[in-house]
Structures are given as C-alpha cells and as structure tokens.
C-alpha cells in the first residue's frame, strides 16, 4: 500500500491555490436555430456588431450581416458541414481583416489572406481591415501621371492615369482579362505593385493566368487573390475588398498600385444570392437595393494621394461582363456611373479579327487625358476622330455604288489605322514603339503599303528602330516628348522601312 505524505498534499494544495485565476471571461454566445445554403440563423449574440466575425463549434467562421429582433443572420465563409441545430456560436469581437506586407508579393491567397499556392504560410506581421474608408477630398490629388497599359489603342485614344477607375466592359470571350494581364506585364520596370482579384472563375483559368505571370516574371510584383467558383458566396463577395486592402497597404507607403477586379458581375451575383437567402427585399433584376453602394464603396478606394499623404496611388480596372452587348442592364450602368471611363469590347469586332476588340466610338476616358504623355498626345489627337469617321463611312459605303476620291482616301487610311492597332496577346509595346506606329498611320506615311501588309510593317518598323535607331527609343522613353529632331529621325526610319517593303514586293 502506497503511503501518502501530508506535506506532499499540502504542497499540492498550496500550488493550486496560488495558480487559481479568479478573472472571469465573458463571451458573447448564441445558438444555431437553422442552417443551410451558406446562411445560419442564430438566437442570442445580443452584443454582436454588424459585419462582426463569429466562430461556430466546428471552427467555421461567418459574418453577422442581418441583425434582427429575435435572431441574427450569418453568412458562412466555409462549408459549415459540421454545424447543427442547437450548436453554439461565439462572437469574436473582430471585424474581418487580411494580412498585408511585402511578403504577399508573388503569392496566391484566398479572400481571407490565407495562402493557397502550396508555398507555406505568409510571413507577415501587419494586417488591414477588409472594409476600410476611402481617402477624403483633401487627401487626394487630381490624376496627372500615366498608367501605361502597353496597348496602343488604349494608350493613344483612351489613356488611363494613375489613380483612375477605368471599366473594362464587354461580352464573354472578347479579351477583357487579356487586356488586364497585358497591363500587368507592362508594369515590369515601372515600380508598380499589381493585385489581380479573380472572382467566381474556374480554378483552371486562375492557374493559367498565374502561370502566364510567372513565366514572364510578372508574379514578382503581383498578388493574386482568388475566390474560385467553388467557394462560398460570402468569399466571392469579400474578394474585391481584400484586393483593395492589400493594394492600400502599398498605396499608403507611397507606391503606385494597380488592382484588377475580374469580374464584378460575379461579385454582384454572389451578393444577390446572399441577400435573397437572408430574405432582404429584392429590387431591380432581383439585386438588393444597396448593390450600388457595394460597388461604389469599393471603387472609391482607388485614388491618387496628395503629396502630404505620400503621393501613392491605386488604379482600379474593374471588369464587367455584359449579355449580348447590353450595356444598359442594371450592374453595367451602375459601374459605368461610378468609374472614370470605360473600354468597351465588342464581340463583332473580335470575331472580325480585330484584337484587342475595342469599340472606339463608345469607349471613353474621362480623366486620363490629363495624364497622357505629350509625345503620344500630340500625334493621337486626330486618331480617335478618324477611326470614328471611318466606321461611319464604312457603313455608308456598303450602300453607295461610286465614291469620290476623298471618301475612298479616308476609307483606305481608316483600314490601315485599324490594322496598325492590332496587337497580339502578351506583347505590350513601350511608349516609343506606340509613338512610331501611330505617327506612321496618322501622317499618311503608309498609304502606299497594302492593307494586308500593315501588321508586318508595324513589326518591321519596331525592329528597325531597335537595331538602327536606339537613340530615338531612349530619347522618347526618357523625355516623353516628340522633338523636331526625333520626328525627323522617325520620318526617315518609316520611309526606309516602307521603301524596303515595296521594293521586296516588286
């Protein structure tokens, strides 16, 4: 029989008395009444805030969105398969936040900031609230620096400035994502941090985009936020705000940032699904009444900050998918009214072989003109007008049997201008190359080149300038002005390439 020494017992009792903690922790808890379709109804949680994070017994997190008299409507940010009627819910006292920092660059994360690229955890110590207030009027500055996309048609006719919101709108499969990826690739030596937010897309599509960025070295300055089609609606709804928060961190550090929301149509659909399941009253096209606010508070976070705030900027390129080119539907008109212009992509132009398929007539940039570089502004002034007139004449000439010489000349030049603006995917052009191409077309220096050889001329001119006139390229890239000497050099180069092409054709 084991003998128990009294001093051992007293020592144990003393230790337990010393270790006794008399502090009482108060936790705000509730009970699940009903769960299904990504929504939980919870009784209790008396002190919960709107938008507060809550935690269920099985570890699933949710956001309290509907605060009603006798219950709280919570959207689940996970499968929630382990949640049952009667299980407890705990309020965390926190609003959703996301980790931020330089360690995010080159990574693929979900809308909660959790790495999903298999490269381990993120080594970040800072975080930002997913919902942050937009900069005020005094904290902003007017847009005055260019955000070069590398796409000649956009940089010449629909220029985008740093801090601008430019909508990319068009039907499915018209090259909306391609324009945005090209813009990211073009920031390689511009010291711009890019954030690509994929909302409700196929995981294969996101993997493909990520691979393209990695192959071309663009992932080093890019963060990918992915809420795939298989994710709960709550995560698809949160994804754009997460992307904005990650970009805001760099913006307030004084850096230029570019955020792409691909696409906000799917975010609006996820928000509609959540709202209908929460039994909020439906409005036009069954969207809730605050879907405009959902997008406006997101896009207002894009800004060009004042000198006192560090001169940083966030440029937003939201994408909207239309049905059969209908830009007068609810979500497209909402986002058009919030943004500072739109690039409209047409499926008819795309199918006719014009890539990028930009409809110049209804595309516009409302603030980017102030940010356009002088070199291209000087020569591209008439480009948009000439193309718009060409479209009208082309439609008219289908019914006219004989055309006068001036009209034929205008049609002939319009065809060549349109060919010049064709550009393969993943091949953005530098400013000097864009200036050279647009100059050749607008000044009528390639009117003798056959239309079918204009694309070849564009390629050969760029190669000729790189190999024979590198001083022209460096001058334009540094000074960003087309001086009389540079113009003379350019004219000589164009004449040389044209004569070589015509001689080889003969």
UniProtKB/Swiss-Prot annotation:
Question: Where along the sequence does the record put site: Required for activity?
Answer: 363
In the Enzyme Commission scheme, what number(s) does this protein have?
7.1.2.2
Could you list the residue ranges forming a coiled coil in this record?
A: none
The record's Gene Ontology cellular component field reads: plasma membrane-derived thylakoid membrane; proton-transporting ATP synthase complex
Task: Provide the protein's localization.
Answer: Cellular thylakoid membrane
Q: Answer whether the UniProt record assigns the keyword Cytoplasm to this protein.
A: no
Cross-referenced InterPro entries = ATP_synth_asu-like_sf (IPR023366), ATP_synth_asu_C (IPR000793), ATP_synth_asu_C_sf (IPR038376), ATP_synth_F1_a_nt-bd_dom (IPR033732), ATP_synth_F1_asu (IPR005294), ATPase_a/bsu_AS (IPR020003), ATPase_F1/V1/A1_a/bsu_N (IPR004100), ATPase_F1/V1/A1_a/bsu_N_sf (IPR036121)
Which Gene3D superfamilies does the annotation name? 2.40.30.20, ATP synthase alpha/beta chain, C-terminal domain, P-loop containing nucleotide triphosphate hydrolases
Which Pfam families does the UniProt record give? ATP-synt_ab, ATP-synt_ab_C, ATP-synt_ab_N
- Provide the topology term for how it sits in the membrane: Peripheral membrane protein
Q: What is its main location?
A: membrane
Similarity-based family? Belongs to the ATPase alpha/beta chains family.
Quaternary assembly: F-type ATPases have 2 components, CF(1) - the catalytic core - and CF(0) - the membrane proton channel. CF(1) has five subunits: alpha(3), beta(3), gamma(1), delta(1), epsilon(1). CF(0) has four main subunits: a(1), b(1), b'(1) and c(9-12).
What functional role does this protein have?
Produces ATP from ADP in the presence of a proton gradient across the membrane. The alpha chain is a regulatory subunit.
Name of the protein this chain belongs to: ATP synthase subunit alpha
